[in-house]
């Protein structure tokens, strides 16, 4: 059996947000992420679940270098990416993208869809013909029409805007996408469509996802493994079935009790 390829690793990740007191002395305001170890494999979806404020979005941003971690090590394809090495971070980020929670605020309201999709291509310094090819392909992958490229974000529904956000993430051909609660701001009727689209794209393109959410039913549907976060720590980790059928932590069982139809397996 072929060994899985580890694409991203994190060891001992900590993120502390500081504030200064009246005298200007720095003190801890929030210890958002504490001693987290995590591995992500090629073609895998790793689900991060937990209640609001548990640190899952902060952890995701630390892993992608969007937030500077306080402590810990990150490895991309086995090579350490030091937190102060901006060149290495940018090189890693060339292969990473993010899909934001709110499709309304994450798109520039003054740009057309074409301008939104061109923005991440600027660093690649492509020819106009190459840009055009990538834009057409990105629109096709998320089932948006060619005519949509000339429209502004306000002309679209929430689900369509999230498709634009997905196209923006895909256009640079990333290896990893952080899906930061990508369906929580959408109508329930649209959520399944977006999750199915993400699953199809993952299978077609071999993408690796970090999928943060508080909806455990959706996380189970899309994820291969799940990490349960509480107060900045991953308190339980495992494949979907072991987490759902035989949770070890009381906190995990509490989260699962809110899932319709969940019943703890006894014995």
Where are the predicted features?
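Conserved ABC ATPase signature
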Residues: 152-156, 160
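Conserved ABC transporter NBD signature motif
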Residues: 72-81, 92
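Conserved ABC ATPase "signature" region
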Residues: 129-147, 256-257
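Helix-to-loop junction immediately C-terminal to a conserved catalytic motif
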Residues: 64
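Conserved catalytic motifs of ABC-family nucleotide-binding domains
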Residues: 173
């Amino acid at each position: 059996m072929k060994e899985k390829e580890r694409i991203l690793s994190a060891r001992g990740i900590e993120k502390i947000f500081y504030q200064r007191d009246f005298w200007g002395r720095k003190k801890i305001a929030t210890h958002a992420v504490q001693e987290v170890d995590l591995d992500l494999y090629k073609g895998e979806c790793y689900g991060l679940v937990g209640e609001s404020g548990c640190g899952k979005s902060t952890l995701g941003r630390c892993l992608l270098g969007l937030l500077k971690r306080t402590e810990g090590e990150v490895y991309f394809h086995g090579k350490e990416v030091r937190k102060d090495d901006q060149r290495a971070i940018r090189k890693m980020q060339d292969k990473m993208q993010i899909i934001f929670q709110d499709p309304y605020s994450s798109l520039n309201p003054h740009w057309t869809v074409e301008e939104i999709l061109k923005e991440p291509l600027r660093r690649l310094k492509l020819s106009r013909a190459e840009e055009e090819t990538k834009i057409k392909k990105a629109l096709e992958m998320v089932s948006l029409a060619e005519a949509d490229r000339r429209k502004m974000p306000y002309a679209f529904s929430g689900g369509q805007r999230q498709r634009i956000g997905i196209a923006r993430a895909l256009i640079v051909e990333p290896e990893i996408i952080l899906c930061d609660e990508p369906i929580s701001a959408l109508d329930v009727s649209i959520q399944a469509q977006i999750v199915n689209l993400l699953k199809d794209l993952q299978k077609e393109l071999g993408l690796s996802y970090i999928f943060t959410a508080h909806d455990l039913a959706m996380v189970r549907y899309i994820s291969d493994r799940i990490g349960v976060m509480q107060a900045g720590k991953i308190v339980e980790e495992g494949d979907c079935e072991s987490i759902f059928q035989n949770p070890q932590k009381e906190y995990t069982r509490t989260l699962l009790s809110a899932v319709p139809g969940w019943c703890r397996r006894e014995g």
